[in-house]
């Protein structure tokens, strides 16, 4: 429903609504995904400080990660410190072609 609204709304929809998909994540967490992120912080920054999120940084929950939960579905070759940007729909994260592919800073929302 949100996607239908966003696709059909006037051009100012991104000024008050953003939808961030998490590739590979199950319903609320887990799956082969970078499923650890703070959407509430992004929302607070938008509502209270006028800083609309253009990306949300997500991490993988794996051995060695600061999280107390371990996502057992992650591939063994993923770094526990893997990060990715979550991009507002319809944009998706694309690797820039240079730098460590485990770090969000080397990806852009396109």
Residue ranges, per PLM feature:
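C-terminal His-loop and adjacent cap/lid subdomain of alpha/beta-hydrolase
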Residues: 1-110
């Amino acid at each position: 429903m949100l996607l239908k609204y966003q696709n059909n709304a006037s051009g100012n929809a991104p000024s008050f609504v953003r939808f961030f998909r998490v590739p590979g994540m199950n319903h609320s967490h887990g799956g082969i995904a970078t499923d650890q992120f703070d959407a509430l912080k992004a929302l607070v920054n938008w509502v209270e400080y006028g800083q609309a999120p253009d990306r949300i940084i997500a991490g993988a929950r794996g051995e060695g990660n600061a999280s107390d939960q371990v996502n057992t579905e992650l591939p063994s070759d993923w770094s526990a410190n893997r990060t990715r940007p979550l991009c507002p729909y319809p944009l998706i994260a694309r690797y820039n072609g240079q730098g460590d592919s485990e770090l969000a800073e080397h990806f852009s929302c396109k």
